[in-house]
C-alpha cells in the first residue's frame, strides 16, 4: 500500500527525528497475520461454499454482495503470509519487485472492494427494508451483478497507483530490501511528500470516510423503520426487534473499530509533513501504526462471522447443509436441502427447524414483516 504500514523507514518529513530505538514486534505481528490468514481463508471459503451451494432460484440480490465480499476478503488474506514473512524478517523483502507490486496491489484492490461491497450490502438492506416496493427493480439479481462489477472495476482503478509506485530497494546504511512506495519517477525528493499525502488522504476518504457515512445513513433508516414497525407488535416481537437492532449496531461499530485507528493514525502521520509533529508524537504514531494495521486486517476474518454466522438463519443453513451431507437428507443439494440452506437469503422464507436432518418437518415461525428480513437477505 502507499501508506500501509510496510513503508516505515525513510520518510522525508521525519528525517530529523531519531528512530534508532524503534522496532515493531517481530513475532506478534506475523502471528496475527497468520491467524487472520487461517481464519479468513476458512471463514470466507465457507461463506462462498454456502452461497453457491444454495439453489439459484432462491438467491437474492444481497447474495452477490456477500459472495463478492467473501472473494475480496479471501484474496486479501492469501497475501498475508508474504507480509508476515516480511515483518518477521524485520522488513526485509525476499520475494522480488514484481511480487512486491502485485501483492501490494491485491491488498489495495481487495481493501477497496471489501469496503464497497459492505456499502453495497448496506444499501441493498436499505432498499429491502425501508423502500421494498418503490425500489424493487433495483434489487433484481442482474442489477446486483452489474453494481458488483462496477465496484470491482472502481477498486481496481483506485489501486493502480500502488502497482505503479511500489518498488524494492536497499536503503543506505542497510542490508535489507524494502518494499515501499517510490515517487521519484513523478516527483523530486522535496515534493514526494505531496504525493504521499495526496494519495493517502484520498484513499482514506474513498476507502473509509465516504463508505462509512453511507453505511451509517443506511442503517440509521433501517433501524428507524424496524423500530417503528415493532412498536405495533406485541411482546413476542421484542426479542426479534432487539436481535435485529443489535446486529445493525455490531456491524457498524465493528467496521469503525477495525478501520478507524488505521486511517486516523495513517492520516496524522502523513500530515506530519505539513504540521511538523514533535518527534515524540511522531515516534508514537510510527510505533502504533503496525498494530493499527493488524486491527484493520482482522476485519477480513470477522466479516464471515458478522455477516453470516451472526444471523441465526444462516447458522441453521450451515448446520443443515453439513448435517445433510453426513446423514443424507431427502433431495439433491440443489433441491430441498439447498432451498433450506438458502433461507438465510430469503426475507420471507421459513427457517429450517433443528430436527430437519432427523427427518422431521421444519418448524414454521409466525410470519412477521421485517422481523424475517435479515441483513443478508
From Swiss-Prot:
The keyword Transmembrane helix applies. One of its GO terms (molecular function) is G protein-coupled peptide receptor activity. Coiled coil: none annotated. PROSITE patterns: G_PROTEIN_RECEP_F1_1 (PS00237), G_PROTEIN_RECEP_F1_2 (PS50262). Residues 335-377 are annotated as: Disordered. The chain crosses the membrane at residues 29-52, 63-84, 98-123, 145-162, 197-221, 245-268, 288-310. The record marks 83, 166 as: Required for APELA and APLN/apelin-13 interaction and signaling. Glycans are attached at residues 13, 173. It is a multi-pass membrane protein. It is found in: Cell membrane. Disulfide bonds join 17-279, 100-179. G protein-coupled receptor for peptide hormones apelin (APLN) and apelin receptor early endogenous ligand (APELA/ELA), that plays a role in the regulation of normal cardiovascular function and fluid homeostasis. When acting as apelin receptor, activates both G(i) protein pathway that inhibits adenylate cyclase activity, and the beta-arrestin pathway that promotes internalization of the receptor. APLNR/APJ also functions as mechanoreceptor that is activated by pathological stimuli in a G-protein-independent fashion to induce beta-arrestin signaling, hence eliciting cardiac hypertrophy. Belongs to the G-protein coupled receptor 1 family. This is Apelin receptor. It comes from Rattus norvegicus (Rat). The lineage of its organism: Eukaryota, Metazoa, Chordata, Craniata, Vertebrata.
Amino acid at each position: 500500500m502507499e501508506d500501509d504500514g510496510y513503508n516505515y523507514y525513510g520518510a522525508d518529513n521525519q528525517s530529523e527525528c531519531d528512530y534508532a530505538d524503534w522496532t515493531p514486534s517481530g513475532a506478534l505481528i506475523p502471528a496475527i497475520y497468520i491467524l487472520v490468514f487461517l481464519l479468513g481463508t476458512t471463514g470466507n471459503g465457507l461463506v462462498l461454499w454456502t452461497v453457491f451451494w444454495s439453489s439459484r432460484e432462491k438467491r437474492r440480490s444481497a447474495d452477490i454482495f456477500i459472495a463478492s465480499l467473501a472473494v475480496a476478503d479471501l484474496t486479501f488474506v492469501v497475501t498475508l503470509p508474504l507480509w508476515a514473512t516480511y515483518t518477521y524478517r524485520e522488513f526485509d523483502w525476499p520475494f522480488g519487485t514484481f511480487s512486491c507490486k502485485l501483492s501490494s496491489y491485491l491488498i489495495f484492490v481487495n481493501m477497496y472492494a471489501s469496503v464497497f461491497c459492505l456499502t453495497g450490502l448496506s444499501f441493498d438492506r436499505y432498499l429491502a427494508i425501508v423502500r421494498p416496493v418503490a425500489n424493487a427493480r433495483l434489487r433484481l439479481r442482474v442489477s446486483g451483478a452489474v453494481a458488483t462489477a462496477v465496484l470491482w472495476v472502481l477498486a481496481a482503478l483506485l489501486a493502480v497507483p500502488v502497482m505503479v509506485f511500489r518498488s524494492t530497494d536497499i536503503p543506505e546504511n542497510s542490508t535489507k530490501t524494502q518494499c515501499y512506495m517510490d515517487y521519484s519517477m513523478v516527483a523530486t525528493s522535496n515534493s514526494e511528500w505531496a504525493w504521499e499525502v495526496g494519495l493517502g488522504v484520498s484513499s482514506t476518504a474513498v476507502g473509509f470516510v465516504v463508505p462509512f457515512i453511507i453505511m451509517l445513513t443506511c442503517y440509521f433508516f433501517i433501524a428507524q423503520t424496524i423500530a417503528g414497525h415493532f412498536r405495533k407488535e406485541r411482546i413476542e416481537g421484542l426479542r426479534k426487534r432487539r436481535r435485529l437492532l443489535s446486529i445493525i449496531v455490531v456491524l457498524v461499530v465493528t467496521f469503525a473499530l477495525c478501520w478507524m485507528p488505521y486511517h486516523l493514525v495513517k492520516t496524522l502521520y502523513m500530515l506530519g509533513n505539513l504540521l511538523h509533529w514533535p518527534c515524540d508524537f511522531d515516534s508514537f504514531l510510527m510505533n502504533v501504526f503496525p498494530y493499527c494495521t493488524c486491527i484493520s486486517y482482522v476485519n477480513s476474518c470477522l466479516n464471515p462471522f458478522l455477516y453470516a454466522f451472526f444471523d441465526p438463519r444462516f447458522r441453521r443453513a450451515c448446520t443443515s447443509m453439513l448435517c445433510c451431507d453426513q446423514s443424507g437428507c431427502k433431495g439433491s443439494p440443489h433441491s430441498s436441502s439447498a432451498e433450506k440452506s438458502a433461507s438465510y437469503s430469503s426475507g420471507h422464507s421459513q427457517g429450517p427447524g433443528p430436527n430437519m436432518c432427523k427427518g422431521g418437518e421444519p418448524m414454521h415461525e409466525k410470519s412477521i414483516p421485517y422481523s424475517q428480513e435479515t441483513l443478508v437477505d
